[in-house]
């Protein structure tokens, strides 16, 4: 009953107790996560588009879609280079919503994450871009809906989570990148951080994942209760070390070595690219 009420009022996206289908549908197969080379290639190809910040937060930090769309500037500390994941966009916000009155709590406990050397310029760029959009709206006499969102439409209103999911695959197709779902950026971040550091506990803390959950995600099996007892606290600096290892690998990666996408059927030249589709 409690889960049903939480689902009804959009505090959670699904009622896990009622879900009987596998997470990945009929094939029950997760697409291969992107390599650091592919992550860098994707970052370069979405530079300057509405996808830039979602890819940074999803691909480098493994944030959930609703956490990305619900991140607000009040929870970003650019002076101390940290940000708090303490809320998320409510589930199924109507497409034409302009103002978010109240955010939903995150799926897991809130967490503080470091803004790395690689990520910092993207936060600054995003902030400056939104300031310019706000000023332009004032000059044009158009409304600007200041929801304080890090990721938003040009008029400040929230981006629909369903739009992100439905258009991400089309974006990758347009960019000649291997197909993954947007949520697989989270799996990409988890896999790369773990492969580079072996520290699955801290990886779980970065992702806001339960210890058992991150173990399942990475295909690990052990006594998680015993591990939890030994590692009851992960300092921010350790999170930074793990993130720096991954972000450093992405920074040094050669995007030319990224795996080529599979050949695709020819598309109509008149068809709009997903990156050009209006939000």
Residue ranges and their predicted role:
Residues 1-5, 20, 115:
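Non-catalytic DNA-binding core/recognition domains of DNA-processing enzymes
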Residues 47, 127-131, 169, 173-176, ...:
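Hydrophobic alpha-helix feature that most strongly marks membrane-spanning transmembrane helices
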Residues 88-91, 115-177:
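Active-site/catalytic core of tyrosine-dependent DNA strand-transfer enzymes
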Residues 80, 91-110, 117-119, 129-132, ...:
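C-terminal secondary-structure termini that scaffold catalytic or DNA-interacting sites
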Residues 75-82, 198-229:
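Short, polar N-cap/turn motifs at the start of nucleic acid-interacting alpha helices
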Residues 8, 56, 60, 67, ...:
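C-terminal catalytic core of tyrosine-transesterase DNA break-rejoin enzymes
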Residues 1-13, 28, 157-163, 178-184, ...:
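N-terminal core-binding DNA-recognition domain of tyrosine site-specific recombinases/integrases
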Residues 8, 12-71, 79, 110, ...:
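Basic, Lys/Arg- and aromatic-enriched nucleic-acid-binding interface segment
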């Amino acid at each position: 009953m409690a889960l049903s009420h939480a689902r009804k009022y959009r505090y959670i996206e699904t009622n896990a107790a009622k879900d009987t289908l596998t997470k990945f549908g009929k094939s029950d197969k997760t697409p291969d996560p992107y390599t650091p080379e592919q992550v860098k290639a994707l970052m370069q190809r979405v530079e300057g588009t509405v996808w830039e910040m979602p890819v940074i937060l999803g691909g480098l930090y493994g944030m959930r879609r609703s956490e990305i769309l619900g991140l607000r500037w009040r929870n970003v500390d650019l002076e101390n280079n940290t940000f708090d994941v303490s809320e998320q966009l409510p589930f199924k916000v109507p497409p034409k919503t302009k103002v978010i009155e109240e955010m939903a709590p995150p799926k897991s406990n809130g967490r503080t994450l470091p803004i790395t050397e690689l990520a910092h310029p993207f936060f600054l760029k995003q902030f400056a871009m939104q300031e310019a959009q706000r000023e332009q709206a004032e000059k044009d006499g158009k409304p600007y809906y200041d929801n304080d969102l890090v990721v938003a439409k040009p008029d400040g209103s929230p981006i629909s989570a369903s739009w992100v999911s439905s258009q991400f695959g089309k974006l990758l197709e347009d960019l000649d990148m291997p197909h993954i779902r947007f949520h697989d950026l989270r799996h990409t971040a988890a896999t790369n951080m773990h492969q580079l550091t072996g520290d699955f506990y801290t990886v779980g803390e970065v992702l806001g994942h339960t210890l058992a959950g991150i173990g399942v995600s990475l295909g690990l099996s052990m006594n998680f209760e015993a591990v939890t007892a030994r590692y009851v606290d992960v300092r921010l600096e350790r999170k930074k070390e793990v993130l720096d290892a991954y972000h450093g690998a992405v920074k040094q990666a050669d995007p030319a070595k990224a795996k080529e996408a599979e050949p695709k059927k020819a598309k109509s030249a008149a068809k709009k690219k997903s990156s050009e589709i209006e939000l």
